[in-house]
């Protein structure tokens, strides 16, 4: 299936996400901070289908990582995760670089849906409207 780089400093979250996505058939590479993720990305010449990154991390945060990836590998899809509302706000205005932001905590179902949507390239607005329609909103 897809080749996914996960950048997450919380080992429990990183392992949960990695196991779930590997179980779904994806090839997973893990990095415990944004700096290491950027190094891996360069070493592998951006050979990933998706970067799934936390926003708040040591060395290089997810926003800086997304900017680096957008500069060096503009076709790579970036999906961010965060548990901090102020960090979600930092991602606003970067819609051209970032597919979406997943708020933490999230369920396995939400993770899998967001990853599938990102890999399929579904526009975020269309995805949101479809979910609202399904929920009767």
What is each residue range found by the language model?
Residues 15-23:
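Charged docking surfaces used in two-component/phosphorelay signaling
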Residues 33-36, 61-65:
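Acidic catalytic/metal-coordinating carboxylates
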Residues 106-115, 123, 127-128:
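C-terminal output helix
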Residues 8:
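Conserved acidic carboxylate
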Residues 30-50:
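Acidic, metal-coordinating helix/loop segments flanking the phosphotransfer/catalytic sites
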Residues 64, 84-102, 109, 113-114:
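Alpha4 helix (beta4-alpha4-beta5 surface) of REC/receiver domains from two-component response regulators
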Residues 57:
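Receiver (REC) domain active-site loop signature in two-component systems and cognate sites
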């Amino acid at each position: 299936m897809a080749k996914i780089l996960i950048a997450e400093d919380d080992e429990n979250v990183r392992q949960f996400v990695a196991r779930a996505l590997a179980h779904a058939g994806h090839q997973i590479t893990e990095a415990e901070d944004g700096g290491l993720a950027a190094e891996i990305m360069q070493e592998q010449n951006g050979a990933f289908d998706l970067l799934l990154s936390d926003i708040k991390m040591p060395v290089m945060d997810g926003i800086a990582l997304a900017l680096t990836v957008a500069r060096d590998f503009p076709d790579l899809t970036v999906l961010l995760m965060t548990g901090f509302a102020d960090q979600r706000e930092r991602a606003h205005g970067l819609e051209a670089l970032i597919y979406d932001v997943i708020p933490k905590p999230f369920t396995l179902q939400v993770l899998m849906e967001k990853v599938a949507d990102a890999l399929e390239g579904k526009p975020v607005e269309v995805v949101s409207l479809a979910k609202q329609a399904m929920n009767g909103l």
